[in-house]
Amino acid sequence: MKEYRVYLERARSRQQDFLYPLIFREYIYGLAYSHNFNRSIFVENGGYDNKYTLLNVKRLITRMYQQNHLIISANDSNKNPFLGYNKNFYSQIISEGFAIVVEIPFFLQLSSSLEEAEIIKSYKNVRSIHSVFPFLEDKFTYLNYVSDIRIPYPIHLEILVQILRYWVKDVPFFHLLRLFLYHFCNWNCFIPTKKSISTFSKSNPRLFLFLYNFYVCEYESIFLFLRNKSYHLRLKSFSVFFERNFFYAKREHLVEVFSKDFSYTLPFFKDPNIHYVRYQGKCILASKNVPFLMNKWKYYFIHLWQCFFDVWSQPRTININQLSEHSFQLLGYFSNVRLNRSVVRSQMLQNTFLIEIVSKKLDIIVPIIPLIRSLAKAKFCNVLGHPISKPVWADSSDFDIIERFLRICRNLSHYYNGSSKKKSLYRIKYILRLSCIKTLACKHKSTVRAFLKRSGSEELLEEFFTEEEEILSLIFPRDSFTLHRFHRNRIWYLDILFSNDLVNDE
């Protein structure tokens, strides 16, 4: 990274065309090759007969410039006619190279912005998924309306490339990137489909994630820009990392849409208590005041996507609901605001009064049905939640089988320990425990009853229920009251950076 930093500092004096030469640096493709296959570029790979060299990549790029895109067919063979090598393999390597090169300036600017804001030490904790829920507990109990928003896709990558050109001044690099997308990914269709997006994301995951995250970052920066301009209140939790020179031209059309109908109304309706939370492709928008303001932001989003990103979005896809009557799903939890009513007797002189107190509490619970559906998909139970054996693991040793089930149980317990109600989590543990017992009984060709009688049911698999208590006892005092209280309350962990699929935990 020091070499990249020195190179970019020299290139900034020219202010353009500083990424294009990196495409022809061999260590870039060495990083891409190691990222995909976890092997060195010079190590022989039997599947490709060691035909991968930088010379072949340069030849492929040259052919991309010379190719007539009018005769490209969607049913082209995977074999490249002018090289005779596997086309998918080279497209994946070049895609990784593009992703690595285009990430460099954004990563360096992001790092410098974090250093200036002096939040490097707390940045890891902020990245945790669970850091969102203390924010929800603190803010959402004072809000009244919530809106679930699904970020629309697919978006044509040509639009993203055009926007990228205004962030990084390097015309040859983005011209080559556009040729690559049209040549290998069949992006010559006018309207991309979800199937083509899915195919591209699987064959070029790193480049797809970068382009998608850039799309989300671009729309969020515009949204926060509009919010700051509308309310004249600067957000302390957000800072613009990059220059804005393309947005101001596009914003004129966006402002015209609202200036006709709301020019005399909007200044009297300002809502500083609007809160926005996003994870992956879903975001939550919550507000305290009247639904009119939520409708205003609803149409802000719709016109932003349609006018700026050319993505069609229907108004009926964004629903506005009351928090007290609607539960929203975020990060694998179901959340809603519950009203707690209590009556207090108050006495003043000779008179006695009954005062009703209403308090709000954010309930965050485990979604039992989606979890059982995931367990059924991974063959731990049937669709009704009845545990079944997993014969695929029967060839492993008893220790490995128990360790695999414990790892899944540990991850689920670690992630869903913030639930208000632990009954659903205990049911998931029970399913995994019986599935483990049935798998061991299947391996030893015995019934569950006979296997438990022979091995001892009390000693077997006791880690499913004791391990979490042992971990808590290392953190908190070992008295029973404290442990019981922490079993009942929520515990959020600041070391969870992503949620694993059950199938990937094998």
Curated annotation (Swiss-Prot):
Major location category of this protein: plastid
Compartment annotation: Plastid, Chloroplast
GO biological processes: mRNA processing; RNA splicing; tRNA processing
InterPro entries in the cross-refs: Domain_X (IPR024937), Maturase_MatK (IPR002866), Maturase_MatK_N (IPR024942)
GO cellular component: a single term: chloroplast
Sorted UniProt keywords: Chloroplast, mRNA processing, Plastid, RNA-binding, tRNA processing
Name of one Pfam family that matches: Intron_maturas2
Its biological purpose: Usually encoded in the trnK tRNA gene intron. Probably assists in splicing its own and other chloroplast group II introns.
Protein name in the entry: Maturase K
Gene (UniProt): matK
